[in-house]
Amino acid sequence: MSREMGELTQTRLQKIWIPHSSSSSVLQRRRGSSIPQFTNSPTMVIMVGLPARGKTYISTKLTRYLNWIGTPTKVFNLGQYRREAVSYRNYEFFRPDNTEAQLIRKQCALAALKDVHKYLSREEGHVAVFDATNTTRERRSLILQFAKEHGYKVFFIESICNDPEIIAENIKQVKLGSPDYIDCDQEKVLEDFLKRIECYEINYQPLDEELDSHLSYIKIFDVGTRYMVNRVQDHVQSRTAYYLMNIHVTPRSIYLCRHGESELNLRGRIGGDSGLSARGKQYAYALANFIRSQGISSLKVWTSHMKRTIQTAEALGVPYEQWKALNEIDAGVCEEMTYEEIQEHYPEEFALRDQDKYRYRYPKGESYEDLVQRLEPVIMELERQENVLVICHQAVMRCLLAYFLDKSSDELPYLKCPLHTVLKLTPVAYGCRVESIYLNVEAVNTHRDKPENVDITREAEEALDTVPAHY
């Protein structure tokens, strides 16, 4: 091991929020997470609202976001517990005078709360999202007592919607495909579901400004036309409220792509700030033709501050916005090196990165974990926008894609984002539809899979086994 490399391995760029013990391994010190622990005690997020008000949509999106920023979160959907306990027949199961069904529903709630306790207290979960109607003060009191007994914080999210068109669209988009209505006539489904809503309306008790003034909550009116926020008490609740005030349900598409092939891509060198190759310039014009063919209304174009994304955007002939946050991951001392050179000069660092690619931070550079934090403002703004084309870089595109597709931190660094390919993301009910469009301009392959042997003592041949070909 060279003296230079030894110094790099032992002298870390410190960005550590949580101190590690002095006996930590080299890998622990290299990981050096920059992610703060957002929770000092677990949080229960409690959904409130009548059926067809978007509670599951909100639960799913919020869970995806919190997991993406590094806060372990899980949804507990009471409807799933109910379906496991009893087969659904019709709306009469939800009648307030159906005492037998009321007992079953309460037992399902208690079973779900038991699983919440297991997740938050034994499985190192930080946030549990309790996705149910919770429309009565009695049910909410039961949950509050449960949270108090176990030392959990509670944050309520109430979705209120009185617009018949929005409610009808939600029923059409989601409920017609519900497991409760498999192989049922659509008109009968609509009739039954509207009667189900009427059953809940009888005893619905919204969160009250005076009676519930001591509680932490956000009320969302008509899918975001107005908000009411009360007693936000910590970081998780603050981020949750801010996130919910930025999302919308307007139909749109997000186009993600990398810059055209660069001169450094051709030579197998990572990072740097080189311009486009001849094929990269050809791709830029192909991208312009593709975007024009889509006939996208009010399209916004975003790039990083790096030459290769700007040159790609210039061919579009439209205004574009530059984001420094979209710059490629900083490879530190390894900038503009080939993988072969990194293995030759810093073999231990190369192995450490393969062992935990998400948390590994390049000496004097960044990790994917750092990059996710850098990109959070981009995600917030993407959620606020309608149609956007983001021209970015491989690591950046992986992070953005992981958010929209709900990929784990283990999967994120290995998502395939090839050059000269556009990914069209269209948000749907509880996820995102992805279309991959290759624009028929050849480019080098820059994707490197995780090698089988990640041990520090491995041979160079094993370390370089998955390195793609380059000039």
Swiss-Prot record:
Gene3D superfamilies given in the database record: P-loop containing nucleotide triphosphate hydrolases, Phosphoglycerate mutase-like
One GO molecular-function entry: kinase binding
CDD domains the UniProt entry points to: HP_PGM_like
UniProt source species: Rattus norvegicus
SMART domains membership: PGAM (SM00855)
Pfam families according to UniProt: 6PF2K, His_Phos_1
Protein name, as recorded: 6-phosphofructo-2-kinase/fructose-2,6-bisphosphatase 1
Positions carrying N-acetylserine: S2
Tagged with keyword Cell division: no
